[in-house]
Amino acid sequence: TWFTPFSHTPIGGILSNTGVCESYTTAYIEIAKKLGLEVGYGESAGGAHIWNIVKVDGKWYNIDVTWDDTSANPYDGDTPGVVGHDYFLISHDELRESHDWSDINYRDQNFKKINPSDINSEKYDGTWVQRYDSPILMDKDNYYYFEGRQGNDGKLVKVSKDTETAEYFDS
């Protein structure tokens, strides 16, 4: 009998903390759909990896929650409060810098094919969101996150949504 400690289902990955990219991607699709977001997925040729795409303000972006999980290897354990954003709302070209596959297929939540050239907005490539490894919270006017490690001389940062100016507070 062959056994793998890894889960490929959305609920299995969440409950067992052993999800692979398929688990992350399908869980994200279900959550995003419940939130009313238009969502889909990207898949490498041969199915070696799968990640999400999401439509924001009429434009498609890549989100790879598997590669942004700092504990994606279940044998390494988890680091509470640490989460990456390197692959959050990035363009197809930005994704290709790290996801080096010859052919990528994109599909929306109804499995309709999407052309990679339709995932070309660079609006969020290289923005402050992708530089920090803490949860990012928001209210009506501001974003909040920790620069550095929370409780380890990290600073709480408040960023205005309108001006993107930052204000720093000692934690």
Where are these regions (language model features)?
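Secondary-structure boundary elements
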Residues: 1-13
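Short, surface-exposed coil-to-beta transition loops
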Residues: 11, 47-49, 153-154
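His-Asp-centered catalytic microenvironments across diverse enzyme cores
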Residues: 59-156, 164-166
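Soluble non-cytosolic domains of exported or imported proteins
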Residues: 15-23
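Hydrophobic/aromatic-rich core segments of domains that either
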Residues: 22-90
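Short loop/turn motifs that cap or connect beta-strands within the blades
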Residues: 169-170
